[in-house]
Amino acid sequence: MNFKNTFFWFTALLSLLLDHLTKLWVVKNFALTVPPQTIPLWPGVFHLTYVTNTGAAFSLFSQGGEWLRWLSLGVSVGLMALAILGPNFNRWEQAGYGFLLGGAAGNGIDRFVAGRVVDFLDFRLIGFPIFNLADVFINIGIICLLIAAWGPLPSRRRAERRPSSPPPSDKLP
């Protein structure tokens, strides 16, 4: 049996593992308090702050976001089916879909197990909502898929369009 899209599976498992381990570390080492416990890594710019979120990114749908667990499950199953039943993807596509799966599964597991997602990355410089590695991986996945959709870089496309030189001739003029 030929196992295809191996980079997809590697990316998905690695991103899921990193997301899970960082959330586990936060839960074990921080108290869930009001106001939230925070550790400034770069004061005023970047902190680790333990909060939970029952909604989606930026706390959207935090009221009645029960359906988000099923959306996470559906996206995860769909991406796995695509990797198994679909074509062999290029590296950018495999990375993109893998990061999407890792992020969707990471937040989905939180939603099924605890009913909420653990967030802890607090970028305060621009007042950004607190997020987690799963959110980062989902965004990286989207960027990878955009790169894949745009195809080769323009310089590479020009080289591919350039007509090849005729083969050298044995006859001299």
Swiss-Prot record:
The active site is at D119, D135. GO terms for molecular function: aspartic-type endopeptidase activity. One of its GO terms (cellular component) is plasma membrane. Its main location: membrane. It is found in: Cell inner membrane. Keywords: Aspartyl protease, Cell inner membrane, Cell membrane, Hydrolase, Membrane, Protease, Transmembrane, Transmembrane helix. It catalyses: Release of signal peptides from bacterial membrane prolipoproteins. Hydrolyzes -Xaa-Yaa-Zaa-|-(S,diacylglyceryl)Cys-, in which Xaa is hydrophobic (preferably Leu), and Yaa (Ala or Ser) and Zaa (Gly or Ala) have small, neutral side chains. The chain crosses the membrane at residues 7-27, 41-61, 70-90, 95-115, 130-150. It is a multi-pass membrane protein. Signal peptide: none annotated. GO terms for biological process: proteolysis. InterPro entries: Peptidase_A8 (IPR001872). Pathway: Protein modification; lipoprotein biosynthesis (signal peptide cleavage). Its EC number is 3.4.23.36. Belongs to the peptidase A8 family. This protein specifically catalyzes the removal of signal peptides from prolipoproteins. This is Lipoprotein signal peptidase.
